[in-house]
Amino acid sequence: MAVLTADKLMTMLHPGIIMIIFGFVVMLLPRSCRKPLSLLAPLVTTWAFLQMTEKSSFPYELSPYIRMEFIHLDSLAWTFMLVFCIIAVLNGIYGLSVQHRYECGMSLVYAGSVMGVILAGDCLSLIIFWEISAFASMYVVFCKHDRISARASFRYILVHAFGGNMLLVGLIMYMFHYGNNLEHLADCIGQPCFWL
């Protein structure tokens, strides 16, 4: 039986999942607790990201044939994550003035899901986090609850659903040829799965 040490636990912390959990907690709390947490969430997430190394991994075996890799950290993902963590901290500062609990919480869920997309090491985790980001961002647009925001969020979800379906078709084609791992993505340049 494998022992879970503190070092092993630190390499398994997924910044995106931490941010998503904070987002749902923020939606449940009263306003006095919501404001500090909306700033604390990106700071904790940035700290968790800075603890990661190239050996960080968060595997999950869905079945004997399907293994999901929620964390794949290379230099490109590290750069994008650093930029996105900075943006998330700035968004947390902006979020201090946001009054609506669901807008504040769903913006954290959206930020966490985009971090999940950046760190995805396989096709399934990529599409899961992609779809979470679609619905979270649609709700952030809809949070004003008036006719204009409802129409804008409907148009947004239609465009995002079309893009998500094209991504899904491309990933299915990619998985058929190369498997679930995203390491061979550069090998399919020029093929239909790459362009979808």
Which role fits each region the language model picked out?
Residues 105-109, 113-195:
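Alpha-helical multi-pass transmembrane bundles of energy-transducing inner-membrane proteins
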Residues 1-105, 180, 184-186:
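Transmembrane helix-loop-helix hairpins at membrane boundaries of multipass inner-membrane proteins
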